Amino acid sequence: MYLIADWRRTHYSKDVIPEMDGQEVTLMGWVHSIRALGKLAFVILRDRAGTIQAVVPKQKVDEETFEIAKKLGKEDIVAIKGKVVANEKAPKGFEVIPIEIRVLNKADAPLPLDPSEKVSAEIDTRLDKRFLDIRRPKIQAIFKIRSEMLKSIRKTFADEGFIEVNTPKLVASATEGGTELFPISYFEKEAFLGQSPQLYKQMMMAGGFDKVFEIAQIFRAEEHNTRRHLNEAISIDSEMSFVNEKDAMAMLEKVVYNCYSDIEYNRPNEIELLELNWEIPEKTFDKVTYTEAIDIAIAKGVEIEWGEDLSRAAERAVGDEMGGLYFITEWPTQTRPFYTLPHKHDNKVCKAFDLMYKELEISSGAQRVHKYDLLVQNISNMGLNPDSFETYLEAFKYGMPPHAGWGLGADRFAMVLTAQDNIRECVLFPRDRQRLTP
């Protein structure tokens, strides 16, 4: 066994090309596979960027190097210093002949999970051994695309003059008055894990920040057990002053469009590896009102009445009709939180919207109430006590501008981008009703 000592990686696997014939390289990673055939050994080394083949001919390497190569096991951690040799018959037009191999760590055998993907495993098994599962190239591709998504979103917000903020995740009361909260002991008080940064975003509008965004955890104590729900999720939230819901929708369109464009440009290998049918959407998405969505659902045989939230059957019906990315707008006021602004001409309808991808909701937003008296009235009308929102309401007494915003589910959006049908595939260590480890 060796320490890394004075060795340092000089290249990732993807950086080595046939034109480097004769050049010395130092590679580091995992043994993806090993074949020893008499006086010849083939070692496939895997790193973050892909795989590369090292060929170990007994007559061209010293005896110690050949013996080390023969005894390698799958997933051993190795460092290989060798020379690039152009070879048209090799898989990538070259191979690496080792000068020295250092075994940095041995992997136990048998492996509880096969990162080479030759043996499939159920998702629960994969999540139990997630550290092995994420070695798989296709799983890494999901998270590289997710990383590119977050990078693109931050860049778009920065280009548009937004300030990134961090709001508390330990809170004294519910954001929306709901019961979907995780209570915790906070010294001598009861506290909760935050279910949304919504109230804080609005308070920052009163503070004159004008445009803010946050990318952070939210916690929902919902007893769902579906492929699209988790109890800990990443939410991408934004809020803007002196705008309405249409401006907020336009900003969301820009964020989503730029994600598709940036991923196509920066992650073509991952798109190919996942065999994604990649299409950059139009810059402006289709829109359908809630009333029109209800009509579509009823026409397709779904039993639903105006004023009800859309059921799964209704979402599927509308998704089948609309396809791709689209907004549902002008929701019934009774279906939305107290801070949503009703339409002036018809207070039964509010200035709220959802962004859908087929049948999946990925974002929700609205123009907010910015008048103190109306906000207090809305809170009371929903059976909540305004006193519970005292610190929030105070921000509306001393000059709150009109404002609007939205929250985009990062995990669900990653599902859409990578064409996964289970949200757990897009979260490193998902938390649901059954899973609290690893």
From Swiss-Prot:
Residues annotated for L-aspartate binding in this entry: 176, 220, 364, 368
CDD domains, A to Z: AsxRS_core, ND_PkAspRS_like_N
Classification via PROSITE patterns: AA_TRNA_LIGASE_II
Chain residues that bind Mg(2+) 2: 361, 364
Entry's transmembrane regions: none
Localization of this protein: Cytoplasm
GO cellular component: aminoacyl-tRNA synthetase multienzyme complex; cytosol
Catalytic activity: tRNA(Asx) + L-aspartate + ATP = L-aspartyl-tRNA(Asx) + AMP + diphosphate
Record-linked InterPro entries: Aa-tRNA-synt_II (IPR004364), aa-tRNA-synth_II (IPR006195), aa-tRNA-synth_II/BPL/LPL (IPR045864), Asp-tRNA_synthase_2 (IPR004523), Asp/Asn-tRNA-synth_IIb (IPR002312), NA-bd_OB-fold (IPR012340), NA-bd_OB_tRNA (IPR004365)
Cofactor note: Binds 3 Mg(2+) cations per subunit. The strongest magnesium site (Mg1) is bound to the beta- and gamma-phosphates of ATP and four water molecules complete its coordination sphere.
Predominant place of localization: cytoplasm
GO-annotated molecular function: aspartate-tRNA ligase activity; aspartate-tRNA(Asn) ligase activity; ATP binding; magnesium ion binding; RNA binding
Keyword Aminoacyl-tRNA synthetase: yes
Cofactor annotation: Mg(2+)
Residues where Mg(2+) 3 binds: 361
EC number(s) recorded for this UniProt protein: 6.1.1.23
Subunit structure: Homodimer.
Function according to Swiss-Prot or TrEMBL: Aspartyl-tRNA synthetase with relaxed tRNA specificity since it is able to aspartylate not only its cognate tRNA(Asp) but also tRNA(Asn). Reaction proceeds in two steps: L-aspartate is first activated by ATP to form Asp-AMP and then transferred to the acceptor end of tRNA(Asp/Asn).
NCBIfam families associated with the record: aspS_nondisc (TIGR00458), PRK05159.1 (NF003483)
Protein name, UniProt field: Aspartate--tRNA(Asp/Asn) ligase
Species, as recorded: Methanococcus maripaludis (strain DSM 14266 / JCM 13030 / NBRC 101832 / S2 / LL)
